[in-house]
Amino acid sequence: MSKQLNPAVPDQPIVLGKMGSTYGIRGWLRVFSSTENAESIFDYQPWFIQQAGKWQHVELEDWKRHSQDLIIKVKGVDDREAANLLTNCEIIVDSTQLPALEEDDYYWKDLMGCQVVTTTGYELGKIIDMMETGSNDVMLVKANLKDAFGMKERLVPFLHGQVIKKVDLTAQRVEVDWDPGF
């Protein structure tokens, strides 16, 4: 199944998905993909997992869509018991494999921790999560401890031009046109 490959471990690891429950008795597992198109997770190889603090390379033998699920067969994992050991393992790749983005497009991982500030200079807090809502992405912003409006968290739509006025990843800052009381 896997072997220690210290020289090849990701320098810039990013989680692209998670291995789910076993499927059948021959070592297949369900996969939950975090990529925009679920099947795109298979475009990024090699996969790594961490178990007991150690990196392990995971080589795919096969994958397929089964009903609504994606299922995988990991090389060397041939029964339910062996597959069960991989349940809930995060699928990790090196983020240098991700394609370059166009202007005004951002990977969520790059927005995490950015300070969100209104156009009037009010600091709303830091981005702690992103959510996909169907119509647009939404930032979950953890408010500063002494927020003047008593907020703990805010949901701010990630609408470039409309709400998002400027993103400076170097300064870890996102400027928004947003009412701090909302």
Swiss-Prot record:
This is Ribosome maturation factor RimM. Belongs to the RimM family. Binds ribosomal protein uS19. It comes from Yersinia pestis (strain Pestoides F). PANTHER family: RIBOSOME MATURATION FACTOR RIMM (PTHR33692:SF1). Keywords: Chaperone, Cytoplasm, Ribosome biogenesis, rRNA processing. The lineage of its organism: Bacteria, Pseudomonadati, Pseudomonadota, Gammaproteobacteria, Enterobacterales. NCBIfam families: 16S_RimM. The PRC barrel domain binds ribosomal protein uS19. InterPro entries: PRC_barrel-like_sf, PRC_RimM, RimM, RimM_N, RimM_N_sf, Transl_B-barrel_sf. Its main location: cytoplasm. GO terms for molecular function: ribosome binding. It is found in: Cytoplasm. Residues 103-182 form the PRC barrel domain. An accessory protein needed during the final step in the assembly of 30S ribosomal subunit, possibly for assembly of the head region. Essential for efficient processing of 16S rRNA. May be needed both before and after RbfA during the maturation of 16S rRNA. It has affinity for free ribosomal 30S subunits but not for 70S ribosomes. Coiled coil: none annotated. It comes from the Bacteria.
